[in-house]
Swiss-Prot record:
Binding residues annotated for ATP, in chain numbering: G47, S48, N49, G50, K51, G52, S53
Keyword match Transferase: yes
Gene Ontology molecular function terms on file: ATP binding; dihydropteroate synthase activity; metal ion binding; tetrahydrofolylpolyglutamate synthase activity
Cofactor: Mg(2+)
Biological processes per GO annotation: folic acid biosynthetic process; tetrahydrofolate biosynthetic process
Family matches, as CDD domains: DHPS
Annotated positions binding (7,8-dihydropterin-6-yl)methyl diphosphate: T600, D633, N652, D722, K758, R791, V792, H793
Region annotation DHPS: where it falls in the sequence: 555-815
InterPro entries the record matches: DHP_synth-like, DHP_synth_dom, Dihydropteroate_synth-like_sf, Folylpolyglutamate_synth, Folylpolyglutamate_synth_CS, Mur-like_cat_sf, Mur_ligase_C, Mur_ligase_C_dom_sf
Name of the coding gene: folP
Pathway listed: Cofactor biosynthesis; tetrahydrofolylpolyglutamate biosynthesis; Cofactor biosynthesis; tetrahydrofolate biosynthesis; 7,8-dihydrofolate from 2-amino-4-hydroxy-6-hydroxymethyl-7,8-dihydropteridine diphosphate and 4-aminobenzoate: step 1/2
Protein role: Can complement an H.volcanii mutant strain that is thymidine auxotroph because it lacks the two dihydrofolate reductase genes encoded by hdrA and hdrB.
Protein name in the entry: Probable bifunctional folylpolyglutamate synthase/dihydropteroate synthase
């Protein structure tokens, strides 16, 4: 079974309406051998609002404590696999295909009997199956509807929570707050473990009546856990303080709003019940818990906020948080489903000066004209109808001044479509043969007949992206009319689905395509603008004075002032030796010197902030007058800050912004920052992560890390991406990353390849000098494949290698 067949089979199950009860899920799991029975500890989180954020907070805290954690949430933004993650990585396509192939006979048989499991039941079973396979320590489950009859209640939780209760799904859960609260309280764990809840008044009384023992969370006196919102500390974070009987945490969270402090308090209480985590893990976990589309601030000047508020209560919470910002005008983009109380939602939101009513793709979306009438009745200033969410967002941002605030709300579906403005990538693929064309098409899950038919037409410029199904169809029609080609994933039968599209054309055809997309519906104008920028059509590349700009590949020399680095540990830990090495690098043509005070080799000991500063600061101060840029290789924001103060120019973070403060340091000092993809740092030699396609998967995972830096205020041109050769990749995967380095330009910034003396070169049986010869060869290949920077230990031979590659590409000066 191919992935597109498996995904279509799964998504087709949405034709079966939801049904309450756990029996169908239990039967499906029984057909798989009940993988959940001997699985991890389960944490089950129910609630009308806040359950997804609380689940993400809980997962992040437990991971910060060193546990392997599965997370099951809904809905997804772009890909159904987002619902099932292990240690932050979504389920692989191969795993999903294996699961669907396994259950297909069972589901088909049950469907023939008129008792097919529903989409949500199957995805829930898939999550539990995946968590068992991955042998996670804890699985955090977000409840779908209610608690008593939800598919997730097939497990016996060791800890659980009810975040909040509002009137919702009254046809299933009951018509009053107490009835709904009692239903949700059925997630309570067995035994003496109290159910954690932030409910109040009648809801709390009903929860207590059913669950018995409860642990209450809130910001009022008498709560077992006090969670206090201290207000924003910057445009993306807020301070919170959380206090229990014998513990207390003060930290920042990346989700704004008073209600998020309560969610954080619930998560902290759950994590302590589940694993006895310490205060430091709670603080680090909460600050690292990024959750797209939940009052997500995409940047400043103007402030742009995405929030999936989809009912009056959630809209009221958004209004309270928006009130924390100073702004001149409020520009709102609103799209909602037809079964929501639009009047109450509009009344709960702050009154906009200008609102754009729009229609997300799903069939359930309310007509934009209806929403426009609702906001006219609610007293909005100017009311416009722009049906495509992407176009509405573009119009709002275009109208906004630096002092305005743009708010996108009404539905997570609307937010998902809006978010593509920041997450869409166009990956260019080198296609020099029929085999290259076939591989590019197969990676996008084009059907085998389509691959056979189209491969001969792809031996030229090939660009892959993800777009809505209706956008893909339009791209296909327009490119065909221009003489180009466009193949779309076989996963194309679902209304509103995001699908891979591979466009094949000459640059002239791409130029005409962008012109034809301008002014078209469905957000295609924005797709065209992004494509034009990505391909550099009619745009001279911007320059900022960095040595990696233009056709030139810069060489970054590694200067480890450590006793235990994997290649040169101990050689330059004496100050004078380090200075002499730096001077030699500069004489031999290095562009950047990267100074590291902590090793990331397997088994390396952690280094304190003080010790790392003692190692790197004296070196930076002594060599700051060299005519090269200085970089500091560190995982710690405080080391980064002091290094920049001492004269460093660039930050190099091998953890990909694991320290939540790192991105803000880079923004504050206007410093370029290297964001690396790493599974573990230091390297764990036993780590063997699954990749469907290592390049596509690393780009997808780096997209969110790059976006974190951008939201903090670091522009894309200063975010250098490093695919992380050797960090959670096999030798074969390392060579694949090297060969396709140019595809990482899809992320919008320079690309760094760090391959120096890596063990991957042992796979070609040419390691006579611990990989030095192989490193120089790979540097030439990296430069030829589009790398902007190569990071190496040995400067002279690698400078020569990249300059030869440069001369081959651009020509040599006859002088």
């Amino acid at each position: 079974m191919r992935y597109d067949e498996a995904a279509n089979f799964l998504l087709d199950l949405r034709r079966y309406g939801p049904k309450p009860g756990t029996e169908s899920t239990a039967d499906l799991l029984a057909s798989l051998g009940d993988p959940h029975q001997d699985g991890p500890d389960y944490v089950q989180i129910a609630g009308s609002n806040g359950k997804g954020s609380t689940a993400r907070f809980t997962e992040s805290i437990l991971r910060a404590a060193g546990l392997d954690v599965g997370l099951y949430t809904s809905p997804h933004f772009d890909d159904v696999r987002e619902r099932v993650t292990v240690n932050g990585r979504r389920m692989s396509k191969a795993a999903l295909t294996t699961f669907i192939e396994t259950i297909t006979p069972y589901v088909t048989e049950r469907a023939a009997d008129g008792a097919a499991p529903t989409y949500f039941e199957v995805v829930t079973a898939m999550a539990l199956w995946q968590f068992s396979r991955a042998d996670v320590d804890v699985a955090v489950l977000e409840v779908g509807i209610g608690g008593r009859l939800d598919a997730t209640s097939v497990v016996d939780p060791s800890a659980s929570a009810v975040t909040s209760v509002t009137l919702e799904h009254t046809d299933v859960l009951g018509e009053t707050i107490p009835e709904i609260a009692r239903d949700k309280a059925h997630v309570a764990p067995a035994g003496d473990t109290p159910l954690v809840t932030a409910t109040t008044d009648d809801a709390l009384a009903a929860v207590r009546d059913h669950a018995g023992a409860v642990r209450t969370v809130g910001d009022t006196a008498g709560r077992d856990v006090t969670a206090t919102y201290e207000g924003r500390t910057n445009h993306t974070e807020a301070a919170v303080s959380i206090t229990g009987d014998d513990w207390s945490v003060a930290t920042e969270i990346p989700l704004l709003g008073d209600h998020q402090a309560e969610n954080a308090g619930v998560a902290a209480a759950l994590a302590r019940q589940t694993a006895g985590v310490d205060d430091d893990a709670i603080a680090r976990g909460l600050r690292s818990a990024h959750w797209p589309g939940r009052f997500e601030v995409m940047g400043a000047d103007p402030v742009v906020v995405l929030d999936g508020a989809h009912n009056p209560g959630a809209c009221g919470a958004v209004a309270e948080t928006v009130a924390e910002f100073d702004y001149d005008r409020l520009l709102t983009v609103f799209g909602a489903m037809h079964d929501k109380d639009h009047g109450a939602m509009a009344a709960a939101l702050p009154t906009p000066d200008h609102v754009w009513a729009c229609e997300p793709v799903p069939d359930r979306a309310e007509d934009a004209d209806v929403l426009a009438a609702v906001f006219e009745d609610a007293g909005a200033g100017t009311v416009s109808v722009t049906r495509a969410v992407e176009s509405a967002v573009a119009d709002a941002i275009a109208e906004a001044t630096a002092d305005d605030l743009v708010l996108v709300a009404g539905s997570l579906f609307a937010v998902a479509e809006a978010r593509t403005r920041w997450t869409r990538t166009f990956a260019e693929t080198d296609v020099d043969s029929l085999d290259d064309a076939r591989d590019a098409l197969e990676r996008a899950h084009v059907t085998p007949p389509g691959v056979w038919r189209m491969r001969g037409k792809g031996v030229h410029r090939v660009v892959k992206t993800r777009v809505q199904t209706r956008q893909a169809q339009y791209l296909k029609e327009e490119l065909l009319s221009l003489g180009g080609e466009c193949s779309v994933s076989g996963l194309n039968a679902q209304s509103g689905a995001m699908v891979d599209a591979v466009m094949m054309a000459t640059m002239a055809q791409f130029k005409r395509l962008c012109e034809k997309l301008d002014g078209q519906p469905y957000g295609l104008s924005e797709v065209g603008a992004d494509l034009r920028e990505s391909l550099g059509i009619q745009a001279a590349p911007a320059t900022h004075g960095y040595p990696w700009e233009g056709e030139r590949t810069a060489v970054m020399g590694i200067l480890n002032v450590t006793p235990d680095s994997f290649h040169d540990g101990g050689e330059y830990d004496a100050l004078e030796d380090a200075v002499a090495r730096a001077e030699s690098m500069a004489e031999n043509g290095v562009d950047v010197i990267d100074i590291g005070g902590e090793s990331t080799r397997p088994g390396a000991d952690a280094v304190s902030v003080a010790d790392e500063l003692d190692r790197v600061l004296p070196v930076i101060e002594r060599i700051s007058d060299l005519d090269v840029l200085l970089s500091v290789d560190t995982r710690k924001a405080e080391v980064a800050r002091q290094a920049l103060e001492a004269g460093a120019d660039i930050l190099n973070d091998v953890t990909g912004l694991d320290d939540p403060e790192m991105r803000f340091v880079a923004a504050e000092y206007d410093a370029p920052i290297v964001v690396m993809h790493s599974i573990d740092a230091p390297v764990d030699p036993d780590s063997d992560p699954d990749y469907d396609d290592v390049v596509d998967d690393v780009i997808a995972e780096l997209t969110e890390r790059v976006l974190l830096a951008e939201k903090a205020g670091v522009p894309r041109e200063r975010i250098i991406v490093d695919p992380g050769l050797g960090f959670g990749k096999s030798a074969a995967e390392g060579f694949e990353l090297l060969d396709r380095a140019d595809e990482f330009h899809a992320l919008g910034g320079p690309v760094l390849v760090g391959h120096s003396h890596k063990s991957m070169f042992g796979a070609v049986d040419r390691y006579p000098d611990e990989g030095g010869y192989a490193t120089a060869a790979a540097s030439a290949l990296a430069a030829d494949r589009g790398a902007d920077i190569v990071r190496v230990h040995d400067v002279p031979e690698n400078v020569a290698a990249v300059r030869v590659a440069e001369a081959t590409r651009t020509g040599a000066d006859a002088e």
